[in-house]
Amino acid sequence: MPYPINEGAARRAKEMNSFSDYKEGSATAEYRAMVDKAAAIAEKQKSRVDPMYHEKIDHLLDTYARKLAENMNQGFAIDARVPSVMIAGPANFPVGKKEKQNRARDSNMEEWRYIQGLLDKIRSTGMGGISADDPAVIEKLQKKLDGLERSQLIMK
């Protein structure tokens, strides 16, 4: 399920914005840690909900992993466009290009926030009510009714 992270782009982004050296594999390690955390959230949610929701949770997890990799790779490409003023120096610094880069960073950050929202979708899958437009609505309602009837019998 993990998607590739462009380590070359991550290195270039680090070199354009920092005097410290890039640690090989650190971008992939950061990505894997985030995906592992999402996978743990998904497994916890699967243990709490009916098995009919497991496929949806897996799909959301895969979407999270794919979009996160795309977002991180895009972020590295954006960061590598224009060097930091600390790296390039103030003489003939391309202010217009830097402003364009900052707008692209803002857009990339909005996308990242949306991707993090997928974790909330994973956490809430199977916890809400039954939707009338759900193709398995009758099956779900019957299962819920059976469970409520069993609870009623136990209470008697």
Per-range role (PLM):
Residues M1-K156:
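Long, charge-dense low-complexity segments
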